[in-house]
Amino acid sequence: MAATSLVLTCASPLFSSPRVISATKKLTTELSISTAKFRRRCSGNNDEVLLEGMPPEYYDDEWQARQREKTKELRRMQREEEEEEERKIEEYREIGTRLKEFPEQDLRKARKLVSSFIRAAEEVEERIEEAAEKGELDELVLMIIWNRLDLARRDDEKDAIRSLDLLYRRVETEILKRQASPAMKLLNDLLNMHDGFEDDAWLKDCRKRMAETFPREDPFSILMPPGFDIDMHQGQLRPPIETETDNTLLRVDFVREVDALLQEVRIEEDATTGSKGEGLDPEAIALKFKQQEKQRTIRQIEAILDLALNLKW
């Protein structure tokens, strides 16, 4: 009985269902067609059977060449994006490595200061000036702001990029202003006195400020102590107490430094003459406005220099 059961189990079924027969025929037909196509393609016959579902241009050599060129271009763009990403990551690692050189306490203090700048919103100018007066602004603060700016650029956060870029420039300007020479500090003050409208009134105020800052260039004024009015012959004649540092700014020193600054700026202008903003896209318009602002500042510095050269007390 067991042997009979084994024979019946291993034998093929006597009756197959219509569904099984149909599937078997379809599979056999597809295999035969695929085999025929493969054989024809390998034999190199001109009457090659087109693959079902493929567009006619698939067999066009020119179309294939164009597709290969597109593929090469896409791969090139992909490589450039990967290289740019690697460059940004390398910059971030470099900044992170540089931050490790500073003590942990200084890092926490600088990060706290930068966070206070970001939270200050409209009062950020006062907060930066207050920090500068306390001597809290240094290279470490700039590096932390740049670190955050780099992260925002990687994440393409446009609002954060704009805010952090302005914050970086403002802090950098304040640091440079504190480290500047007396002549550059005076020049910065004179430029900030301009309200943007009245040039004549601004030049008049500049002349008055220069006359008060520069010592008079005559023998009697040089011999007299500070505070003595040479015109009215009034004031103390006691010699001034000598100090370790003399912050007196001479007109000749101011003229020399401002003229050197102008020469340097003009050289940079000549080097960037060909990169003028053209077109109506946002970047070109921003570049054009920046160049106009720079030219206006140069003209103001030239006016200040001419005023200092011809200053009369």
From Swiss-Prot:
GO MF annotation: an example: rRNA binding
Keyword field: Amyloplast, Chloroplast, Developmental protein, mRNA processing, Plastid, Transcription, Transcription regulation, Transit peptide
Domain of life: Eukaryota
Transit peptide: 1-22
Keyword Cell membrane: no
GO annotation, cellular component aspect: amyloplast; chloroplast; chloroplast nucleoid; chloroplast stroma; chromoplast; etioplast; proplastid
Principal cellular location given in the protein's record: plastid
Annotated compartments: Plastid, Chloroplast; Plastid, Chromoplast; Plastid, Etioplast; Plastid, Amyloplast
Disruption phenotype: Impaired chloroplast development from proplastids or etioplasts leading to reduced chlorophylls and carotenoids accumulation. Reduced accumulation and maturation of some chloroplast-encoded transcripts. Leaves are pale with enlarged intercellular spaces, and loss of differentiation between palisade and mesophyll layers. Partially restored by cytokinin treatment.
Protein's gene: PAC
The protein's name: Protein PALE CRESS, chloroplastic
UniProt-listed PANTHER family: PROTEIN PALE CRESS, CHLOROPLASTIC (PTHR37219:SF1)
Upregulation: By light.
Organism: Arabidopsis thaliana
Expression tissues: Expressed in green tissues, including leaves. Accumulates in chloroplasts of mature stomatal guard cells.
